[in-house]
Each structure stands twice: as structure tokens, then as C-alpha cells.
């Protein structure tokens, strides 16, 4: 591609961003991905929920011309994306089983004529022979695969229908592919590249950090009472509560309803029309809280979810990260609350042991152990989360329960040296439970058979409890001094960073283990910019009225972050309105007048 053409496409991309989507600047990583896609090269995009993944294929789709096909796993997610694109004046459509034959034929005709620019479709529909024949006759410019982690068996959400997508590369060798996901570790990334046949792709891994989400943990004592108090403190904010079973979902929703809280149950066992009604009410702010199994969420693009509660601990950090990521997609402050009981972990471990032995079970065990370590962390929870995804960071976040109410610190160098020495002396071949038994001088047959009762480190930690040493080793893992080798049954192994600690050359502070977890405590940190709260409330009311009249979710009109910016800047002209993030040319034409009129009346004091 000629240099002049590349520069022209880059300037067109910025124009599309500003005029169509109403954003003044690209977010970190977006511009590189978009430029690469426009050059015709494959991309793998790993970007957190709310990080702007969709724009990575939507912008090039509008610059390139032709048709971009987007593979998406859920009908609700497709419909939501299409609604938002149509509100921005983009010719988008979807094909799914809920449409009539006439509707489907109309969409197909739009694709054939070049009228449709973005087509959303489920993987199983895309892979039908007759559809692939149609596709071969359309002006296909790019294929985007959303939720791409679903193709990997090592991922936390493997879907067999995604596996068939691997055949597409042979049929479309010249078409650029873009795979997108919010959660993929290194193994899953390699799997996605291999299975989709991505050719020398740009692999763009953005920071996994969601700084606006506060990570909190509450140990379960009287869980339902604690949950009721927590929800009542949220004062009408939108939230999702995840439970591990359908019966618990229904029981929890019923108890919330009995307290006068606007809540509904959602799980795969409910009728389709019931699920659709719950989802629609939630999207439209007619329902405050959805209590759900993990069946709920992937299809949710609601930006103003202010809290996500895990009433039961998830099976892995990937699921936890993805589910908590449904909070605060608008970039405004949000909270992720995990209710934790060690007995829940024990139950999940028992369930896991009932599965067939093999590599998949080993990986699930490793992931479950990592989730347990997160729950029992004595150090900044965000650091534990980011280090799990391979994003080394050492500065505490200041926005989690540990940072806001820090555990007591002590000189942990001696304990660290004892633990590291024991790991080293047992040849870095054993897991945490065994290492702790050697440290505490346990008298069991396995230790005697291995001859480890003769080691100088045997029993050097007997004065401390089992829980104490588990906490110490977990902290050493979180600090990057120890790793768990999943290929060797999570054997503990020292990193290069452990050497100076082992030699006693550097100081090391550890957290005094909280054998009893931190009791719930009010930790309300004030948030929010310098905006007019009264005007914001009026703007929200107007938005809801327009959304109901147009039969669309309120955030499709403007999201909360856009309304806050309006309440901050009080734009009175079209030019001022276009400088607000989230207001593009099409939305200004469609919704601008009533919002500017309301702001004018508020500024003049005419609406009091």
C-alpha cells in the first residue's frame, strides 16, 4: 500500500472516530490496531472489558469499505451492538434465529448490495455451507472474531461451535482476520493464533488494569444479611449478583424482592422469553439488580453497572475478571465485591477431583488455586490480579480493601528465607501443601520415604500454623519470588528475584496473615468530578424519556460518562456539544436539541 494511501486512511480513521462515534482521541493501543488492520494484516487484540475493543474493528470497517463480518456468540450481544451502531448512523445488521425469513432475506440483500457495512453473526450460522457460498460473492473486507478465547480448550469458556472457525482461513486466505478477547493468558493466545490460522499477526495486549473498579472482599458470616446490607448501601445503582447454582439464584432474588429491592433471577433454566424480559428491563434501567448464574453477562453491554457481587467464589481468575469487568464500562467508579468462605473453595476442589484425571484437570486445579490465592491475598488485590495475567507491577493500587485498610506488616525476611530454603531443598518439585508439611515437621510416610525428614529445613517453621505458612508462600508468589509450575502439579519454583531474599541481602516486609478475614467495614472513598449534580439528574431523566419513546436502552442515547461531561461543561451550541466525548454528528442530529434546550433552561434558571 502506498504511503499516501496509508496516511489518508489514518486521517479517515480519526475522522470516523470523531464524527461517527463522538470521541476526540483513540485510547491506548487502539490506533496501532486500527492502522495494522487497515494495512491488511491479521491482529489478536487482548483488551479489558470497557477498553474499547469494538472500535478496533468498527473504525477500520467504515474506512475500508466493503463488508466486515463480526462473529459474536450471543444474540443479545449482537442486537445491542447493532442498536448502538444504528444510533451512530452506521449501516449495521445481524443475522440470527429470532428473525423472520423476510427479515433475514432483507439483511442478506443489504450485504449483497454493499449497503450493510457490519454484519454480526453467530459462529454456527456463519459456518453453514450455503452461507459461506453467499459470503464468497460479497465484497468481504475483514473478519472479526469477538470473544475469541471461546476457541481455546485451555480457555475458561470453550465453545465447540467456535472450533469450526479454523476452517475459514483456508477459504479466505487474503482477508484480514481480527481476533478479540478480554481474557486470554499466554497459552490461550497461542491457541487462538494457531486455531484461527492468523498469519504473522500483530498481538496487542493492553493493560488488564481497570483502575475505576474497586476490588473488595467480605468474609461470609451471615451471608444473606451481609448481602442485604451491601445492596441497600448501593442506593438504587445497577448491579449484578453472581451465584454458583440456579436454586441459590432464585432464593437470593426472592429474598431481595421481599425487602422491596428491584431484583430478578436469571439462569439457563428459565424460559427464553423470561430471560429476554429480565435482560431488557435491566438494559433499560427498569430493573436495578439481576441475580444470575454465569449464563448472564457475556451478552451485556450495559455501561452503567456500578457493582458486581460474587456471592460464591468463581472457579478461576479469568471468569472473575470477565464478570467483574461488567462493572464500570463507562469508566466511572464501580465496585467488585467477593463474598468468601474457605468452605466454598473446599467444595469446588471436591467437585474438581471428581472429574477425569489428566492435563485439563491439572489446569483447572491450577486456576482454582490461583483464585483461592486471590481471595486470601494479604497484598494489594489488583497486583495479584495483574501478576496472574503476567503484567508485572509493584505499586499498590490504593483502591482495594487491602490498600484501603492495610493488614499489619512485619519483618518477614526470616519467614521468607525459611520458605524459600525449603522449596529449594526439596528440589523445587513439590506443591504448597507438601512444602508447608516439611516446614512444620509433619511426621508422615511420604516425607519419610523422600528422606525429607533428614533435611536441615525440616521442622524449621513448626512454631507457626499451617495457615501462616500458606499465607507467607502465597505472598511470595504474589511478590514474584516464587512461581507455580502448572506442568508439574503446581510445584513451587524460585524465580531469579528470590536470590537476594534467600541470601538475606534485602529487607522484606510481609503482611501479618489474617487467619480471620477482615470484617466488613465502611470504606467509602469520595469519587466524582466537579459537575453539576442537579443538571446530571435532569439529563438522566430526559435520557430515560427519550429512550422509552425510541424503544432503546438509555445508554444507546448517551452513556453516564457523556452526561457527566455535559453536566460539567454545560454545552449550549452544536459545536460545544460535539466536543463532548460520546456525541458524534449523527447523535447530535438525532438527540442534540432536547439536551441543549434542557441545559439552556437549567443555566438560565427557567426550569426551576
Indicate residue ranges for each PLM-predicted region.
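Accessory DNA-binding and partner-docking regions appended to nucleic-acid-acting proteins
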Residues: 1-13, 363-365, 394-608
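Helicase motor core with emphasis on the C-terminal RecA-like subdomain
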Residues: 3-7, 11-20, 24-28, 32-44, ...
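Flexible coil/turn residues that form the inter-helical turn or adjacent wing/linker of helix-turn-helix
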Residues: 173, 235, 378, 428, ...
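Short, charged low-complexity linear segments at domain edges
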Residues: 360-389
Amino acid at each position: 500500500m502506498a504511503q499516501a494511501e496509508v496516511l489518508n486512511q489514518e486521517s479517515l480513521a480519526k475522522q470516523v472516530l470523531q464524527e461517527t462515534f463522538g470521541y476526540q482521541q483513540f485510547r491506548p493501543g487502539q490506533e496501532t490496531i486500527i492502522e495494522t488492520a487497515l494495512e491488511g494484516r491479521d491482529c489478536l487484540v487482548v483488551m479489558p472489558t470497557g477498553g474499547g475493543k469494538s472500535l478496533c474493528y468498527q473504525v477500520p470497517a467504515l474506512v475500508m469499505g466493503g463488508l466486515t463480518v463480526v462473529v459474536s456468540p450471543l444474540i443479545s450481544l449482537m442486537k445491542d451492538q447493532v442498536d448502538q451502531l444504528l444510533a451512530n448512523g452506521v449501516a449495521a445488521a445481524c443475522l440470527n434465529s429470532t428473525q423472520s425469513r423476510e427479515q433475514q432475506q432483507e439483511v442478506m440483500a443489504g450485504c449483497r448490495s454493499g449497503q450493510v457495512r457490519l454484519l454480526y453473526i453467530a459462529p454456527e450460522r456463519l459456518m453453514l455451507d450455503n452461507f459461506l457460498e453467499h459470503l464468497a460473492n460479497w465484497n468481504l473486507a475483514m473478519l472479526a472474531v469477538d470473544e475469541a478465547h471461546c476457541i481455546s480448550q485451555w480457555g475458561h469458556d470453550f465453545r465447540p461451535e467456535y472450533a469450526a472457525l479454523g476452517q475459514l482461513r483456508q477459504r479466505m486466505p487474503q482477508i484480514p482476520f481480527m481476533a478479540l478477547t478480554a481474557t486470554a493468558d499466554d497459552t490461550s493466545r497461542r491457541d487462538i493464533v494457531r486455531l484461527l490460522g492468523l498469519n504473522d499477526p500483530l498481538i496487542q495486549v493492553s493493560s488488564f488494569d481497570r483502575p475505576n473498579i474497586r476490588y473488595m472482599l467480605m468474609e461470609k458470616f451471615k451471608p444473606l444479611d451481609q448481602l442485604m446490607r451491601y445492596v441497600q448501601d448501593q442506593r438504587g445503582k445497577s448491579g449484578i449478583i453472581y451465584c454458583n447454582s440456579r436454586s441459590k439464584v432464585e432464593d437470593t432474588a426472592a429474598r431481595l424482592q421481599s425487602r422491596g429491592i428491584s431484583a430478578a433471577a436469571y439462569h439457563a433454566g428459565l424460559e427464553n422469553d423470561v430471560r429476554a424480559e429480565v435482560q431488557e428491563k435491566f438494559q433499560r434501567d427498569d430493573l436495578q439488580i439481576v441475580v444470575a448464574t454465569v449464563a448472564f453477562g457475556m451478552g451485556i453491554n450495559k455501561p452503567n453497572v456500578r457493582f458486581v457481587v460474587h456471592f460464591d467464589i468463581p472457579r478461576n481468575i479469568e471468569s472473575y475478571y470477565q464478570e467483574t469487568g461488567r462493572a464500570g464500562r463507562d469508566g466511572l467508579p464501580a465496585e467488585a465485591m467477593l463474598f468468601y468462605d474457605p468452605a466454598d473453595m473446599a467444595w469446588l476442589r471436591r467437585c474438581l477431583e471428581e472429574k477425569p484425571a489428566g492435563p485439563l484437570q491439572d489446569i483447572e486445579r491450577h486456576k482454582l488455586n490461583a483464585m483461592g490465592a486471590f481471595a486470601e491475598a494479604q497484598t494489594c488485590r489488583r497486583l495479584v490480579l495483574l501478576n496472574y495475567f503476567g503484567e508485572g507491577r509493584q505499586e499498590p493500587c490504593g483502591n482495594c480493601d487491602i490498600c484501603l485498610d492495610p493488614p499489619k506488616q512485619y519483618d518477614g525476611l526470616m519467614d521468607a528465607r525459611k520458605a524459600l530454603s525449603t522449596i529449594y531443598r526439596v528440589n523445587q518439585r513439590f506443591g504448597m501443601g507438601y512444602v508447608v508439611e516439611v516446614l512444620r515437621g509433619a511426621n508422615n510416610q511420604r516425607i519419610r520415604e523422600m528422606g525429607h525428614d533428614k533435611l536441615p529445613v525440616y521442622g524449621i517453621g513448626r512454631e507457626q500454623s499451617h495457615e501462616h505458612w500458606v499465607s507467607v508462600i502465597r505472598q511470595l508468589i504474589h511478590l514474584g519470588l516464587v512461581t507455580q509450575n502448572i506442568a508439574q502439579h503446581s510445584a513451587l519454583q524460585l524465580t531469579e528475584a528470590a536470590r537476594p531474599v534467600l541470601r538475606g541481602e534485602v529487607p522484606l516486609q510481609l503482611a501479618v496473615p489474617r487467619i480471620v478475614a477482615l470484617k466488613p467495614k465502611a470504606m467509602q472513598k469520595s469519587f466524582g468530578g466537579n459537575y453539576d449534580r442537579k443538571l446530571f439528574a435532569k439529563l438522566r431523566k430526559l435520557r430515560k424519556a427519550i429512550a422509552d419513546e425510541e424503544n432503546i436502552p438509555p445508554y444507546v442515547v448517551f452513556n453516564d460518562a457523556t452526561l457527566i461531561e455535559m453536566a460539567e461543561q454545560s454545552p449550549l451550541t452544536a459545536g460545544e456539544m460535539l466536543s463532548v466525548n460520546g456525541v458524534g454528528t449523527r447523535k447530535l442530529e438525532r438527540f442534540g436539541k432536547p439536551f441543549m434546550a434542557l441545559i439552556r433552561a437549567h443555566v438560565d434558571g427557567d426550569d426551576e
